[in-house]
Amino acid sequence: MRAKKSYGQHFLINESLAGSIVKKALAVDPDLPILEVGPGKGVLTKYLIESGREWKAVEADRDMIAYLSNNYDIAEGQLISADFLKVKLEEVFNGKPFILLGNFPYNISSQIIFRAMKYQDLIPSVIGMFQKEVADRIIAPHGSKTYGAISVLNQVYYTGKTIFKVSPGSFNPPPKVQSSVIHLTRQLSLPESVKLSTFRTVVKSAFGQRRKMLRNTLKPFIKETSLLESGLFSKRPEQLSVQDYIQLTIDIQNQIE
């Protein structure tokens, strides 16, 4: 069965790596079930089955659902035929937290991360395969060239590290780029006083013109011009840490309230 470009499919064929990825997920917390996104032909799924851990998988491609059902011993309800971005995650394990795992479809991998952020109360850990460029941006430290809006927004909720670097030959068909598996671990989220919508707007606006100083890009949000004299506003977006962006949002909120 061939991979479909419309689903961003690149099937992982490196068995040793597949086993190692699942082993990492199983080690996070023995009491948590695992939700796999985009199981494809089941290279990760079979190790989940062997583990005896409670698990489910979300697959948008109905042909893959049929393939998995015909080739593996899978109980009714373990395969969810749906677009992951539309699944009500609070219903998957009846409100129970879970580990998010997958060789994520490259065409929606960033959206998967944003969805994990939205449901961070349910998802204490993410272990996923990404294009290396995307993975690097998700976990990039401030001050680096790859640090951007997705870095800041993710790191409010999760700390991250690369656990495997993966060459194109580990897939069929091989992608044209390198890949990475990263492990995200939940940390403290935004302070209750910070409005998520305002925080996102500030971060995305700041990086919308990353070569400009923040006093220029964020000027439309400022009513009290004295605030622009703050040291944070004299910097460019990549120079600010996550905590700096939280403080920036608080400052902007305070002048409105």
Q: What kind of feature is each model-predicted range?
A:
Residues M1-S205, Q243-I250, E257:
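Catalytic cores of RNA-modifying enzymes
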Residues R186, V203-E257:
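C-terminal lobe and adjacent flexible extensions of AdoMet/dcAdoMet transferase-like proteins
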